[in-house]
């Protein structure tokens, strides 16, 4: 595929950061629509890591870095969780000396290296016209870097925290909410059996959506989120009141 004149535009897809159940369906949806519109689709392995490890030689084996996606390939994977392209937390603008690919070690030998020039060369070598990174703030922040360098990027937010500003929906968030609700419902039996006040902490980084929405759905009595200060004394009073009002004596 490399360096050949092409009649089709090429889309590259990668997944970075943590895994969520909706990644494979997202990859499938993009791939099938793109193929039917006449595009060629390349899936990069292990997020941005696949893009920095490409060897720019026509006879090089780059199968560990990317694969050509087909309808058959994505149809086999889309019913499973996670990402069949694999993922990593690699950020090409912050690559440690030990993580620099072997073929680039003679060129990059600082403690922290910016491999963006190599990424751009690799994209050109592979004939990628558009890149679709799927990930959270760190993955997408590097997508912004490539956009600033003049490359065409379409970012898809993926984070259970729902903390990517300016977006309507984050892949993984809805699953986080339903799983949190299920777990909270299961823990209620233990809280009720022992007549306890149960405190549950959920993931969410610096955003309170993962705690607030399950509470609004009725699975918890009270909720505290990082966006607002709270009084531990007042919270304690409310939880004691909730417990006393509950016939099973828990909150």
Language-model features: locations:
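N-terminal phosphate-binding or glycine-rich loops at protein starts, especially the Walker A/P-loop
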Residues: 2-58
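Short glycine-rich or small-residue beta-strand-to-loop segments that form or flank ligand, phosphate
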Residues: 10-18, 84-86, 129-133, 198-201
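Short glycine/serine/threonine-rich phosphate/pyrophosphate-binding segments
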Residues: 20-30, 51-52, 93, 114-117, ...
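A glycine- and small-aliphatic-rich helix-loop capping segment at beta-alpha/alpha-beta transitions
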Residues: 28-37, 58-68, 145-155, 171-175, ...
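Glycine-rich nucleotide/cofactor/substrate-binding loop typically near the N-terminus or early
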Residues: 34, 39-125
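Short, acidic/small-residue loops that bind anionic groups at enzyme active sites
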Residues: 38, 44-45, 147-170, 224-231
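Accessory alpha-helical/coil subdomains and C-terminal extensions
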Residues: 122, 130-135, 143-145, 152, ...
């Amino acid at each position: 595929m490399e360096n050949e004149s092409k009649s089709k535009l090429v889309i590259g897809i990668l997944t970075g950061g943590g895994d969520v159940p909706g990644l494979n369906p997202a990859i499938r949806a993009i791939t099938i629509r793109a193929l039917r519109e006449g595009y060629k689709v390349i899936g990069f392995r292990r997020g941005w890591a696949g893009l920095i490890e490409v060897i720019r030689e026509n006879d090089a084996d780059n199968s560990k870095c990317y694969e050509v996606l087909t309808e058959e390939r994505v149809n086999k994977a889309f019913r499973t969780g996670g990402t069949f392209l694999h993922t990593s937390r690699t950020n090409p603008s912050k690559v440690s000396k030990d993580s620099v690919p072997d073929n680039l070690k003679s060129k990059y030998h600082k403690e922290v290296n910016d491999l963006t020039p190599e990424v751009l060369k690799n994209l050109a070598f592979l004939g990628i016209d558009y890149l679709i990174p799927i990930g959270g703030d760190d993955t997408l922040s590097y997508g912004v870097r490539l956009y600033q360098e003049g490359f065409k990027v379409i970012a898809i937010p993926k984070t259970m925290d729902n903390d990517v500003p300016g977006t309507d929906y984050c892949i993984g968030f809805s699953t986080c909410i339903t799983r949190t609700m299920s777990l909270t419902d299961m823990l209620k039996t233990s809280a009720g059996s022992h007549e306890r006040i149960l405190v549950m902490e959920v993931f969410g980084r610096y955003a309170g959506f993962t705690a607030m929405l399950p509470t609004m759905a009725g699975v918890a009595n009270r909720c505290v989120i990082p966006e607002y200060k709270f009084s531990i004394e007042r919270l304690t009073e409310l939880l004691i009141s909730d417990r006393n009002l509950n016939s099973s004596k828990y909150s």
